[in-house]
Amino acid sequence: VKAGKGKGTYQFTMAISPLDCMGCGVCVGACPVNALSMVAQEGELPQQDVFDYCVAEVSEKKDMQDNTVKGSQFKQPMLEFSGSCAGCAETSYARLVTQLFGDHMYISNATGCSSIWGGPAATSPYCTNKAGHGPAWCNSLFEDNAEHGLGMFTGQNKIREDLADETRQLIAVEWARPELKAAAQAWLDTMNDGTANAEPAKAYVKALEESICTVEELAAMPQLAAHAAELKAKGALLCDCAACTLAADILSKKEYLAKKSMWIFGGDGWAYDI
């Protein structure tokens, strides 16, 4: 498979999970060259090791992911093995959206088929990548889904606006570390761009974590030893200066630092078709 002009060429394989196949047969009917056939599960169970290896060891190739239709299919789907009906179009759309935005995605899901296969009791077809990032999903049975989704969008926007204000205050602190200020400014500069903001958000979290002084670290500084003793007597664990206080508060909401992609999923329920 050629990634594109001036990019790499890769070997491509399709590994099937015998334990997760839903048995619907849609893939067999859709294959244009009759390359697939349905067989008894028992004889294919040894192939589970192949599937597990591919999931665990094969990494995404970034130069295959150029947001074209072809390129999107080499990204990890974060919707898998749902209990939807055979050939369900809803899951095809939802899977594609997770391939494009799944690692920074919020979903407000209307009640209907899309909430039944999307959030059945005790399980979820939505998954995470190796970094533990994936879609955050929510459904409200008795609330209009447009309002529910708008509320999620507005709420996280307000939290991020507050984080931006705190970040500007942090940059203004005279003694804040230069590397922390640089990371903070890089985050501010990209905070409204979902693609560009991903790496600056990670770097900002790392810089925040490294910038906070503990009381024990303060005690090792002769000029701050007395203040450290006062903090220790109060049971404090961290420095209470403006920079450390702001950094700790920003870190308490770090899941909102990365720009999110907000989606409202409908379905037959929202369309008044059930």
Predicted regions and their residues:
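Gly-rich Lys/Arg/Thr-decorated short loops/hinges at beta-loop-alpha junctions or inter-strand turns
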Residues: 3-13, 69-80, 143, 182, ...
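Mobile "lid/hinge" segments at catalytic clefts and subdomain interfaces of large enzymes
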Residues: 119-157
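N-terminal leader/propeptide and maturation segments of large enzyme subunits in energy/redox metabolism
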Residues: 141-171, 175-180
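N-terminal amphipathic, basic-rich helices that act as targeting or association modules
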Residues: 71, 79-111, 115-121
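Short acidic, glycine/serine/threonine-rich loops at helix termini
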Residues: 26, 47-51, 118-123, 128, ...
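Amphipathic alpha-helical binding modules
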Residues: 222-249
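Iron-sulfur cluster-binding cysteine motifs and their immediate structural context
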Residues: 1-2, 9, 13, 17, ...
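Thiamine diphosphate
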Residues: 91-96, 106, 116-120, 182, ...
